Amino acid sequence: MNKNIKLILSIFTLLVAVSTSGCIDQTEENSSQDNAIVVAVSILPQQEFVEKIAGDRVNVVVLIPPGASPATHEPTTGQLRDVADARAYFTVGSGLPFENVWLEKIETINEDMLIVDCSEGIQIIEMHEEEHEEEQNAEENEAEAGHDHGGVDPHVWTSPMNAKIMVENTYLGLIEIDPDNSEFYLQNKEAYLKELDEADATIRDTLGEEGGSFMTYHPSWNYFATEYGLDMITIEEEGKEPSPRDMQRLIDEAEEKNIKVIFVQAQFSTQSAEAIASEIGGEVVTVDPLAKDYIDNLAIITEAFSHGITKE
């Protein structure tokens, strides 16, 4: 009997110890989360940039969620409430339509928040002159539709070399609001920059140096194309569907260059792309420039482009 009582007491003591340990671990985890700095970003790729540098020392508020378009998204009440607690807002800063519309309004919600322009130091690509003229002629309509890029291409992050600059700017913002962790941020930033260099090398090895052409519905890939010597042919221009004459021109160009893949993204209509693909005996392939897992997504994009680019 005494042996049974001792056994029961031993088991009870063990259970109490495990339970107490679990409570302590949970308390420490909750405390870590409670002490994390709140920062805001515009797009999902930036979430990886911040988290790779700062780890669990930050909570990231992403203002444009998965599946939403930077041209039309409006922040929710909950997002704006979170921004009110943010120490910093890391903007893309290159004419992103969402920021053009909402940045000043967001600043009024939290006047003490540090605003970091992550495109500082990046050479911004101007739109083609004819595109800019179209924009000026229909400025009011395009602004209402959310497609006013202010004459520049906002998709700077699609080039991993530009992403490195964005990461540097993110790091500088983080050490400004949290200098006590600057060494931790520096080590993580340097490690992530090496990952981006490795991704860039893989892209160059995969795509080669011969150049080539590809066709895409929305002009999201200009910086990627420029980085790797590619010619991007765009179906949509400044938020407008192609006219019948433009459709025929695109079909003729695709046939001339033996293009068999039309790239689209989930945030936009695929109707025109599917019509062109049908005419040229090609296929429509979805690639997402706004995916959260930036480096993993670069590998997916590169694989897709390696099959969709036609060499000169």
Annotate the PLM regions.
Residues 1-31:
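Secretory targeting signatures
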Residues 23-312:
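Extracytoplasmic metal-acquisition and chelation regions
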